[in-house]
Amino acid sequence: MGVQCNSKLLLLAVLITIILSSILVQAIPHKQKTSYQQLLLQSEHVQIPITVAEGDTICFNVSDNPCNFSSYWNHNNCELCGWTPFYSEYAGYSENKSCHPRFTCLHDTKGLKLHNVTTNDSGIYTRNVYYCDIPCNISDDHKHNVEDFDNCNTTINRTHYIITVSSSRYSKRTNSHVATHVGWTATVVIIICVLTYVNVTTTLKHRLRTRNNVNHTM
């Protein structure tokens, strides 16, 4: 009876371990699942999902554009940054501080930096690059008088950065949840080891007692 009881307890412990392990796998934070940046190429459009924690700083560094390219950063129908190639130095550069996120336009690389992001800053940040049908060697006299900006209508590249900002409170709660499951799983594993040891020891004693009884009867 003792051997059968220990075997049942061992099977029960194994079953509990399997259940806890399945729960633990499902409790892995969403942030860990999406920490990698998966590129989804759709012709000239690129989508880059990024997940960060609240309070982080995000920096999008991109290479400079040729002289006959123009580029713009947009978020929620608001143009954050813009560079027009026909103007000299900063004359063709625009930065709209009335837009919602705290950001800085990186003039040297035509990039974008988001500061101390919050959950409200989650969304799509799009960088549009256009080819302009205007020669690069336009004279200085005409650089400030270019009116045919409509010639910059050929889209070369459009990159959508899909930003998800997770709450720090959510991250702490999730990490605590995972740590709890890890602790329970470790405890069950220890219990299984103890039960296995007890089961093997009891079985050996039972066999030895049976053998001794047989020897005595003979």
From Swiss-Prot:
What keywords sit in the KW lines?
Answer: Late protein, Membrane, Signal, Transmembrane, Transmembrane helix, Viral envelope protein, Virion
Give TM regions: 178-198
- Keyword Membrane recorded: yes
Q: Spell out the subcellular localization from the entry.
A: Virion membrane
Note the topology in the membrane. Single-pass membrane protein
Cleavable signal peptide: 1-27
- Name one cellular component (GO) term: virion membrane
Which family is it part of?
Answer: Belongs to the RL11 family.
Protein name according to UniProt: Glycoprotein UL1
